[in-house]
Amino acid sequence: MTTLEYMDPRETTLGQGAIAHNKFKAKQFYYGDPSVAAGDQSIEDGDAYEGLAKISNDAGNDVDKSGVSSGFLEDLLDELTDAVVNTGLTFDRARFMCSQQFYNAIYDEQTPVIRIDGYDADVEYGPQGIRLSTEFGSAPITPTPNIQAYGGLSGVGSDADLGDVFLFDELAVQFRQLAPMSTVPLGRTGLADRVSMFEYYTLVDRSQGNHTFRLKGYDI
């Protein structure tokens, strides 16, 4: 991401502001809780949107997993099966989101197969995709750095944890954007342009939380 090999836009003030905003938006996607009404423009501000944790909590779909320290794939498959049996969720529409550490913990429980022949210059080790597969479809497990323990939260994110796993319906949960990120010039200070960034968006769950689950705090 360079401009004429001269400047990396990520190192400009505007670039850093965009990075901070995207991190904020990703954090809000999981743990946003406007019911706190913190009034501080945080993910717990009254103008924040409800994240997956809030949606699942309001639907009564939080499941305590603090006592599970092994057999993660088997447990996830059991939870997925229960969700399919008891709701309108289907295997081919389900997706799990987890922390990168939990993703590694899943892989550590499996028996790796390493193949090396005379033409191999490198040895590759690590997962390149994990899915729970059935004859009715498969549900991918996707790691993200945005599921973690966050300090300073008092709502549903107060117990955010690296062991959290979110299960949701990909067709029901959608990120709706009313206006993409844009900038408005505010003037100049010396040689610097001052701009304001804005974006209008929200998270929508058309299942009203019935297909959204938070599996809380696996012991990893």
Protein language model features and the residues they cover:
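Sequence/fold signature of self-assembling virion shell proteins
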Residues: 4-8, 42-78, 103, 107-220
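Hydrophobic alpha-helical segments and helix pairs
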Residues: 16, 28, 32, 48-51
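Sec-exported extracytoplasmic/periplasmic mature domains
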Residues: 18-26
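Short, glycine/acidic-rich hinge or "gate" loops at secondary-structure transitions
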Residues: 26-44
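Short, basic/hydrophobic alpha-helical segments
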Residues: 77-92
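Beta-edge loop/turn motif
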Residues: 87, 93-102
